[in-house]
């Protein structure tokens, strides 16, 4: 049995299979292009698609978690249309003569670093948002599927962190709990967990590998603990608590 301690977002007990969710570690290549204007056109087309996709996610989130929590997707739309963000992408494409994917990735990294260095907690949270919109744009430019469901069976979802677009694309009926390595009590994952009224932990230092993935897990939201591959005594005690 492995035991990890995190910060509890919402109380309660969840018992089920653990699924480790990992983002694709995308390596964006810097490619010289002959026609920067054509590359800018690709970016503008991707941006239009991205804004439309975020509108769909906003409507979905409104139905599932309410307008207040869905508003983050309107924020993402505004960030995608932000003059500073767009001017940075354009400058990199035209001054360096490179592909749109590289320009978006570089801009996203630069803006995320800027937000992460800020003193205000709210502004630091925006680093994850700018990474999310940049990843969406890169996925569109690459022709990837950005709307696929991320979970197909009931499970405790364990991840490094989860972006708003990732949480809203999950089948809520199959999410037993959220557990993230990073994230704060004010993160989007935490807010969603409270809205869904499911046990959840953030700031939990557990490995995201085969020692956890697929194992039986217990999330104890009362004290911020996750048990991986629990012994029979612990499992019986938690099952009893859940029925009380």
Regions found by a protein language model. Give the residues of each.
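Non-catalytic, soluble scaffold/interaction modules
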Residues: 1-244
């Amino acid at each position: 049995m492995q035991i990890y301690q995190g910060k509890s977002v919402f109380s309660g007990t969840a018992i089920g299979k653990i699924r480790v969710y990992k983002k694709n570690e995308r390596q964006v290549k810097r490619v010289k292009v002959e026609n920067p204007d054509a590359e800018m056109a690709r970016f503008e087309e991707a941006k239009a698609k991205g804004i439309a996709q975020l509108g769909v996610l906003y409507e979905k989130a409104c139905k599932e978690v309410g307008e207040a929590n869905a508003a983050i997707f309107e924020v993402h739309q505004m960030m995608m249309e932000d003059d500073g963000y767009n001017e940075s992408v354009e400058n990199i494409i035209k001054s360096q003569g490179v592909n749109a994917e590289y320009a978006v990735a570089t801009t996203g990294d630069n803006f995320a670093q800027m937000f992460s260095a800020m003193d205000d907690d709210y502004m630091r949270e925006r680093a994850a948002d700018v990474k999310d919109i940049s990843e969406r744009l890169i996925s569109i430019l690459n022709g990837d599927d950005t709307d696929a469901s991320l979970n197909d069976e009931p499970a405790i979802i364990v991840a490094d962190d989860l972006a708003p677009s990732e949480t809203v694309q999950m089948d809520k009926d199959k999410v037993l709990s959220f557990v993230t390595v990073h994230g704060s009590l004010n993160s989007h994952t935490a807010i969603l967990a409270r809205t869904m009224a499911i046990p959840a932990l953030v700031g939990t230092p557990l490995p995201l590998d085969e020692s956890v993935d697929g194992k039986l897990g217990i999330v104890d939201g009362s004290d911020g603990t996750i048990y991986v591959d629990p012994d029979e005594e612990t499992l019986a005690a938690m099952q009893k608590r859940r029925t009380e």
